[in-house]
Amino acid sequence: MWHFAALRRHLSKENAVNGQLNLSASPATPATASRSKILMMAIIAGAVITNIYCTQPILPLIAADMDVNLATVDLVAGAALLGFAVGLALLLPLGDRFDRRKLVLGQIIGAFLFAAAAALAPGIWALIAASFGLGIVSCVPQQLVPFAAVMSLPGDRGRSVGTVVSGIMVGILLGRTISGVVGSAYGWRAVYGVEAAFMIPVWIAAAMLLPRGVPSTNLSYGRLLASLWPLARDHRPIRESMIVQALLWACFNAFWVNLAALLANGPWHLGSAWAGGFGIIGAAGALAASLGGRATDKRGPRSVVAASIGIVTAAFLLLAGAESSLALLVIGVIVLDIGVQSGLVSNQTRAFAVDPKAQGRINSLYMTATFSGGALGVVISGWLMTRYGWSGIVIFGIVLGLVAALVHWSGKPRREDVFSR
């Protein structure tokens, strides 16, 4: 888990260079969360995020049922990620202005409706549209991350945020497993049906668990959105974190969205259940990457970001042999998820440090960039897979890793521009 307790409110010059700062709650928000509540928030976050990633293991099933090629069916997964990015940009800033509890409950209802629409979609373009809508309303997990922070005491805040983020990552990866098994047994429409049905107990749990959120700003919605660009423009740590994590997330999704096609074709000829099963392996890697949070506290986020970029790039070097070796595929999955999760933790820590009172807006910028990168990664990698096969995916991942390294090292380490309070 993340351990932000080591990050102090007032930084020494050395720590400022590494971008360390305490994630402070809004002073108006009471710290009321028990560990059991935070754990339930993590479960809710993990359950909702599966709406975005449940499609990936069943893409070959959708392609076969609707008689479309891989490049076209990949748009279903890409639409979900793009919709998620839109939701992050337009809905997440509202958490600084309005009651987050009402936002979360409304979005879960929307997720139920769009998942049901996807299950009943008559054609590929209707499915793409439903997937886009499902993505927009499924940004609930990123509403819960700052919610967990402001509900916790300062000494527990890092653990609370880390618990919710770990729930998100486990939901992403295990959601693929469940999707693969259900899709293999009952067809791809059943996957969306299960997602829709699951939103009912999730809504009930959220309604019972979440307290009323206290706004941290009185800015109008228009001014909230207008304040996003200056945050990115004026603060280099936010800009760099956005770009680097967008590139790493593009790598992450380029692999996962094409894994089912790799396994379905020669030499493996394995079905969607196998593709989903790799989610368990990836979840192990994501849990192991909690060490990255500890390293962020000790060494500062910049050094951990650099290590994460190297790990992700190394993962694609291992995955180059995935067409002929399941062992390399398994190892590559674990290494990839460790690298991406460590990057997510360290980049987000660095961005949040700029202004703790604008966590909703910073999170909106950061996660919008992240999932926009993921959506582009899906679309581009689908074309590469169709044209060049698995080699195209591997080269794509390595190139993105090198670009991320260039962005990260283009600016010399110096005192971070910490928000003046």
Protein language model regions, located:
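Juxtamembrane intracellular "pre-TM" segments in multi-pass secondary transporters
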Residues: 23-32, 211-242
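Conserved MFS/SLC helix-loop-helix module at the cytosolic interface between two early adjacent transmembrane helices
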Residues: 86-124
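Helix-to-loop junctions at the C-terminal end of transmembrane segments
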Residues: 88-99, 288-301, 385
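Cytoplasmic helix-loop-helix junction between adjacent transmembrane helices
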Residues: 130-168
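Intracellular juxtamembrane helix-capping segments at the cytosolic ends
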Residues: 140-152, 342-355
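Helix-loop-helix hairpin linking two adjacent transmembrane segments in secondary transporters
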Residues: 162-210
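C-terminal transmembrane helical hairpin of 12-TM major facilitator-type secondary transporters
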Residues: 302-347
